[in-house]
Amino acid sequence: MDNKKIRNFAIIAHIDHGKSTLADRILEFTNTVSKRDLKEQHLDSMDLEKERGITIKLNAVQIRYNSYIFHLIDTPGHVDFTYEVSRSLAATEGALLLVDASQGIQAQTLANVYLALENNLEIIPIINKIDLPSANVDKVKAEIENTIGISAENAILISAKNGIGIEKVLEAIVNLIPPPQASDEKDPLKALVFDSYFDIYRGVIIFIRVVTGKISVGDTFKFMANNLKFSVIELGISSPNQVKKEALFAGEVGWVAASIRNAKDVEVGDTITLVENPAKSPLPGYKKLVPVMYTGFYPVDSQQYNLLKDSLEKISLSDSSIIYEPESSKALGFGFRIGFLGLLHMEILQERLEREFNLSIIATAPSVEFQITRTNGQVQIISNPSLFPEPNFISEIREPYILAKIFLPEEFLGQIMGLCQDKRGIYVDLEYIDDFRRRLIYKLPLVEVIFDFFDRLKSLSKGYASFEYEVIDYQVSKLQKLDILLNGQKIDALSMIVHKDFAYPKARDLTQKLKEIIPRHSFEVPVQAVIGSKVIARETIKAYRKDVTAKLYGGDVTRRKKLLEKQKAGKKRMKSFGVVDVPQEAFLAILKTNINEK
């Protein structure tokens, strides 16, 4: 295959800007998929992706256009999935920057464009949805030039939905995106592993971009990070269905099956090379992202613990950003502490476990990693609030802070600044992008952002604000552990870390919510919020009362009293031994409480 005829590219776009639709039109226009077989969001393979209208997993597909071969790597657009975007961009030479003509550039688009610029990719600006009445092409062109600093004079105007301008996009890919670097077949193999998934018959299938050399069926290769060796049984390309080949050459994107049975053997972002003629060093520039929040996942049925363990292992193959370890809770039994990139990431994993593996999951409230200095000088990093030491053993607590960049229309500036102040934010800067749009920069505690910040941001701005963030440092904060007691028993899975100034309103709000959510029992259940040994808020869930006197037909009043006394004694006994049922909604209530309402 002539290297000069290959083009590798990704599509960068915010959610709902039409990325999956553009991918569909490209597949249709080039006859990669026949019109009869094409379905909406063709590259989005999960039902979840289609239902939510988002791309979660990245996909790679080979497209033939005239005498050229394109490798389109479809990427997610949500802030939680930046990890997936960084992988796909590392495997390409160019990117289509897709911007909605009515909404303009959003924060996440910008974050991904900067990733592309860091990778020295050729960027082609494309303005989509030009047929909408609210489209403002000139304004969007000016925005692209002012915020990104690339020329938008020759931006391609399209309507992906109606197929307008698709041919111009294909011609631009040919003319503007550079071909992969030429490489001799005899050069040592270097190939970037940018994705993987588990096939029950063939083991782990890895997706690779060959940078130098070639890889053939029968070759023995090794992963450079862990030195594990495997032999190629099958390899090929996706078009978009898998097509087997004998070899993959420099510049090509394809899949490799090598009977890899253990999920942990594959590290996405690793470099593979041949055992016979190995490369001296791996490919540069790959960064592994660290989870920003941690949550406990427990099976409702404790018998399903092993099924949950196996399911997590299988899912972690196709989502390498998930990190998990076993943990136990007095209230919930055995489960796992799982690291995520954000709340959407967590919701999607829970839905996948429930749909694909028929598991019922209880998820505890998310937390972040805190740095705790004990009074003896020892420093601990703890992400599970129930493992916090007692207050008298803590010298100081440091929490992670983020730098948040919020894009918003000027009319919502006041409300959004108010939201940031509520979340203990520190004002950094305000930039004027144009006459209508502003970029607000705040330092915020990460623990405040992972709860309901994104929802409230969208709600206050009617959906027009968007934001991106990066974790910058740890800062000392006045934090305390808030425990919840139900019927005098500490429920470790409901423990949380709160700021001293907001502990009381948070406790009051949470106890009221738990009172509404936890079903009534046949005995009275006190709900208490405590810090250390001090109760700072209390509610009582009233008992429901069975009418034990219903079967009496008049007669002696002492008989009635005797039955009521017997019921009272029974309830007293139940109260001391009774188990309180805590539904999943109780753990979610922690997310929904208005943390900082004083």
Swiss-Prot record:
Any one annotated GO CC term: plasma membrane
NCBIfam families from the UniProt entry: lepA, small_GTP
GO MF annotations in UniProt: GTP binding; GTPase activity; ribosome binding; translation elongation factor activity
Pfam families: EFG_C (PF00679), GTP_EFTU (PF00009), GTP_EFTU_D2 (PF03144), LepA_C (PF06421)
GO BP terms: positive regulation of translation
Coiled-coil positions: none
Enzyme class: hydrolase
UniProt domain tr-type G: residue ranges: 4-181
CDD domains: EF4_II (cd03699), EF4_III (cd16260), LepA (cd01890), lepA_C (cd03709)
The protein's name in its UniProt record: Elongation factor 4
Documented EC number(s): 3.6.5.n1
Catalytic activity reported: GTP + H2O = GDP + phosphate + H(+)
Purpose of the protein: Required for accurate and efficient protein synthesis under certain stress conditions. May act as a fidelity factor of the translation reaction, by catalyzing a one-codon backward translocation of tRNAs on improperly translocated ribosomes. Back-translocation proceeds from a post-translocation (POST) complex to a pre-translocation (PRE) complex, thus giving elongation factor G a second chance to translocate the tRNAs correctly. Binds to ribosomes in a GTP-dependent manner.
Main location: membrane
Record keywords: Cell membrane, GTP-binding, Hydrolase, Membrane, Nucleotide-binding, Protein biosynthesis
UniProt family annotation: Belongs to the TRAFAC class translation factor GTPase superfamily. Classic translation factor GTPase family. LepA subfamily.
Localization per record: Cell membrane
Lineage: Bacteria, Bacillati, Mycoplasmatota, Mycoplasmoidales, Metamycoplasmataceae
Record-linked PROSITE patterns: G_TR_1 (PS00301), G_TR_2 (PS51722)
Residues that coordinate or bind GTP: D16, H17, G18, K19, S20, T21, N128, K129, I130, D131
Membrane topology of the entry: Peripheral membrane protein
